[in-house]
Regions:
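A structural alpha-helix within SAM-dependent methyltransferase catalytic domains
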Residues: 6, 29-32, 98-102, 129
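A short acidic, Gly/Pro-enriched loop at the edge of an enzyme's catalytic core
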Residues: 71-82
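A short SAM/SAH-binding and catalytic strip from SAM-dependent methyltransferases
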Residues: 81-94, 117
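Class I SAM-dependent methyltransferase SAM/SAH-binding core
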Residues: 16-20, 24-72
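Conserved class I S-adenosyl-L-methionine
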Residues: 110-137
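Conserved alpha-helix/loop element of class I SAM-dependent methyltransferases that forms part
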Residues: 1-15, 30
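A short glycine-rich, Lys/Arg-flanked "PGG" loop and its adjoining helix->strand segment in the class I
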Residues: 95-110
């Protein structure tokens, strides 16, 4: 995945780059290695992720990491490029995130964003929402708000234009991962479902995840042997700051 997203970047080596939702910092460090006369800042809302990145990936003098909310970035007209890879779909208040990204970019600079859009196929997040509303689980989620963004590529483009960007390019692809076993798929779920499972007692979390994946197989399994396939759409959007 890292090689895919890095291939999207046309770097001269002198840019100042911001990586929004940098996670463990690995991709951010690879960007830093391509900027011999530039620099990159990786930000993430998770203090734990930033601590990991600082301890494991801060190996370049032109690389910094900081805890920051994508909706409230504390920069102004500073970056030549903003990138974000599979992070922004976890921010339902996307207007705020896009406005924030627009503010930190220099005029006529670019944002290269990769996220998971809504598509024709029912998503894993759609199934999570259906599952938590069923009678067995609904009582645990009375105050719950869906943490996921559900926009089609077309809707995302309109949203970006509304927040001061011009859509320079959009690419959509259907992706699939084969986890090959239920245990591996459940391990993935234990991380991916955390915004839902944190509302459950510890003893119910495995049952909830199993219920979700059983329901998901009904919409994602197209043929025998595909019981542990995760299918999703990926959108790469290039935005120009006006």
């Amino acid at each position: 995945m890292a090689s895919e997203v890095l291939a999207l970047l046309d770097l001269k080596g002198t840019e100042r780059v911001l990586d929004v939702g940098c996670g463990n910092g690995k991709t951010t460090a690879e960007i830093a290695a391509r900027l011999p006369q530039g620099s990159v800042v990786g930000v993430d809302a998770s203090a734990d992720m930033i601590a990991f990145a600082v301890n494991h990936e801060a190996v370049h003098p032109n690389l910094q990491f900081a805890v920051a909310d994508a909706r409230e970035l504390l920069y102004q007209d500073e970056f030549d490029l903003v990138v974000s890879f599979n992070a922004l779909h976890w921010i339902p208040q996307q207007d705020l995130a896009l406005r924030s990204i627009h503010r930190v970019l220099k005029r006529d600079s670019l944002a290269q964003l990769r996220l998971v859009p809504k598509g024709e196929r029912k998503s894993l997040e759609d199934v999570l929402e259906e599952t938590r509303l069923c009678p067995r689980w609904a009582g645990y989620f009375r105050s719950f708000r869906d943490p996921y963004l559900h926009l089609t590529p077309e809707q995302y483009g309109i949203l970006a234009e509304r927040n001061g960007f011009k859509v320079a390019a959009t690419r959509v692809a259907a992706k699939s991962w084969d986890f090959q076993s239920q245990s591996a798929f459940l391990a993935f779920g234990s991380v991916t479902f955390v915004e839902w499972t944190r509302h459950l007692p510890q003893g119910e979390r495995l049952a909830f995840a199993t219920d979700v994946l059983d329901r998901y197989r009904q919409v994602a399994c197209d043929a025998p042997g595909e019981e542990n396939f995760f299918r999703f759409y990926q959108i790469d959007v290039t935005l120009s700051r006006r």
